[in-house]
Swiss-Prot record:
Cystine bridges: C101-C193
Glycosylation sites: N3, N9
InterPro entries per the UniProt record, alphabetical: GPCR_Rhodpsn (IPR000276), GPCR_Rhodpsn_7TM (IPR017452), Olfact_rcpt (IPR000725)
Gene name linked to the record: OR2T5
Bilayer-crossing regions: 30-53, 62-83, 105-124, 144-162, 200-223, 241-263, 277-296
UniProt KW Phosphoprotein keyword: no
Family that this chain belongs to: Belongs to the G-protein coupled receptor 1 family.
GO biological process, one term: detection of chemical stimulus involved in sensory perception of smell
One Pfam short name: 7tm_4
Residue ranges that the UniProt entry lists as topological domain Cytoplasmic: 54-61, 125-143, 224-240, 297-315
Protein topology in the membrane: Multi-pass membrane protein
UniProt function note: Odorant receptor.
Name used for this protein in its record: Olfactory receptor 2T5
């Protein structure tokens, strides 16, 4: 925060201007309503999934514990950007202070990084369940699950603690207009009037590392799962194994694909319009899709939901 204060004193200004989504829309009011509905669906969908996992004894397993953690991250993730964006649209304000911008940046970096590692942990959990079913209760006991989940949150926060202070310490004298709907690192860095090429290279390496470790774990886990499934004699066993993995792979492809575009492709591929559309996808749409993917394609979750609705209807 001291760096942010010095920056503000140096430039004589304190507020950034978020150009946002609504300025480019022909129907900003309609877009606001759509985003608000998506936001409510994301919160309610993930909250219901967490409630089902907590209340139904059949869902008290490591796989569903990690799904509940993913739902918690998604609820926090969409809440970092959407409420402020909608409130600013209603109030007719598009400014964000430097400390507020830094906090938003830290939170979304932490949550995105945590989700990267959580998706890798979920792949490892599927590997142990399918390849070592007899040892699964020991290898993935409750203490191990808590340790792995805590590790995901910690490693995600490392990304936030590394990139946020450096990004916010640059002098911003070129422009204060952020061509984005929230304080994303590339959109803020481009405003600096100092040479950021070294920082951008280091940020690229950091993001490669943040993606490479989870992708390696996911790829290795699913390679071993495929080999194990190939050896199965039971067609029903193969079907069940693929069913439990397909939902997770869908989420991995959606989330990692957007992250690769944002942080690993050269700047020549980027435009403010493309960047915002990709960010809308992984910050707003992904949190609403995840609970649908994990519930509609999962018999246990759908069974728990039907049971809960039946009990409520009877009462």
């Amino acid at each position: 925060m001291a760096n942010i204060t010095r920056m503000a004193n140096h430039t004589g200004k304190l507020d950034f201007i978020l150009m946002g989504l609504f300025r480019r829309s022909k129907h900003p009011a309609l877009l606001s309503v759509v985003i608000f509905v998506v936001f409510l669906k994301a919160l309610s969908g993930n909250a219901v999934l967490i409630l089902l996992i907590h209340c139904d004894a059949h869902l008290h397993s490591p796989m569903y514990f990690f799904i509940s953690q993913l739902s918690l991250m998604d609820m926090a993730y969409i809440s970092v950007t959407v409420p402020k964006m909608l409130l600013d649209q209603v109030m007719g304000v598009n400014k964000v202070s430097a400390p507020e911008c830094g906090m938003q940046m830290f939170l979304y970096l932490t949550l995105a990084g945590s989700e990267f590692f959580l998706l890798a942990t979920m792949a490892y959990d599927r590997y142990v369940a399918i390849c070592h079913p007899l040892r699964y209760p020991v290898l993935m006991n409750h203490r191990v699950c808590l340790f792995l989940a805590s590790g995901c949150w910690f490693l995600g926060s490392v990304d936030g603690f590394m990139l946020t202070p450096i990004t916010m310490s640059f002098p911003f004298c070129r422009s204060w207009e952020i061509h984005h709907f929230f304080c994303e690192v590339p959109a803020v860095t481009i405003l600096s009037c100092s040479d950021t090429s070294l920082y951008e290279t280091l940020m690229y390496l950091c993001c490669v590392l943040m993606l490479l470790i989870p992708v390696t774990i996911i790829s290795s886990s699913y390679l071993l799962i495929l080999l194990t499934v190939h050896r199965m004699n039971s067609a029903e066993g193969r079907k069940k194994a693929f069913a439990t993995c397909s939902s997770h792979l869908t989420v991995v492809i959606l989330f990692y694909g957007a992250a690769v575009y944002t942080y690993m492709l050269p700047s020549s591929y980027h435009t403010p319009e493309k960047d915002m559309m990709v960010s809308v996808f992984y910050t707003i749409l992904t949190p609403v899709l995840n609970p649908l993917i994990y519930s509609l394609r999962n018999k246990d979750v759908m069974g728990a939901l039907k049971k809960m609705l039946t009990v409520r209807f009877v009462l």
